[in-house]
């Protein structure tokens, strides 16, 4: 195979994240059809997660202290940091508040586990910029998420 298949990236990323306790749907199956050395098709089956995408949630609900979405986002962000991982497409539609109230990461086809600190820091900055663009029309929401990240850092010294 000349390149990494996105389905295989999602499959591997999902297993690694779950191994380290990061909430994400469980990868169930991955099938890659090949013709000689070239890949023809790839299929990925993930566990179904019922819930609400952050993108579709009312902004007031997103920052509702009772749901704890900003604090959970800060936890997901720091869990990725500990793994030196970047999502690659950190938009609100790739975060689901499941029916149990747990914030899950989805759409892992661009996840990277970095070896180089420089590449990691650059991509991490892109992930945060992409996430904050979700709320460009609502500075209050951005402020709440930034505050949650700062509070998380301060709580862990």
Regions found by a protein language model. Name each.
Residues 1-53, 75-83:
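Conserved ATP-binding subdomain of kinase catalytic cores across diverse folds
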Residues 29-32, 92, 97:
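Hydrophobic/anchoring residues in structured secondary elements
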Residues 50, 92, 110:
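Short, glycine/acidic-enriched loop or turn micro-motifs at the edges of active sites
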Residues 54-63:
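AlphaC helix of the protein kinase catalytic domain
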Residues 65-76:
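Conserved alphaE helix
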Residues 85-92:
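Catalytic-loop of the protein kinase fold
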Residues 94-106:
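Conserved protein kinase catalytic/activation segment
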Residues 103-157:
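C-lobe/activation-segment region of protein kinase-like
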């Amino acid at each position: 195979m000349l390149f990494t298949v996105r389905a295989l990236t999602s499959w591997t990323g999902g297993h690694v994240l779950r191994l380290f306790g990061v909430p994400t749907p469980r990868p169930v199956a991955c099938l890659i059809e090949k013709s000689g050395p070239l890949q023809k098709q790839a299929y990925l089956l993930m566990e179904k997660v019922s819930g609400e995408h952050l993108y579709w949630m009312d902004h007031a609900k997103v920052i509702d202290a009772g749901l704890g979405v900003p604090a959970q986002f800060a936890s997901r962000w720091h869990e990725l940091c500990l793994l030196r991982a970047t999502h690659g497409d950190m938009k609100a539609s790739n975060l689901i508040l499941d029916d149990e109230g747990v914030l899950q990461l989805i759409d892992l086809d661009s996840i990277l586990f970095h070896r180089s600190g420089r590449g990691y820091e650059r991509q991490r900055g892109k992930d945060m910029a992409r996430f904050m663009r979700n709320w460009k029309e609502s500075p209050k929401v951005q402020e709440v998420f930034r505050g949650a990240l700062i509070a998380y850092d301060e709580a862990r010294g």
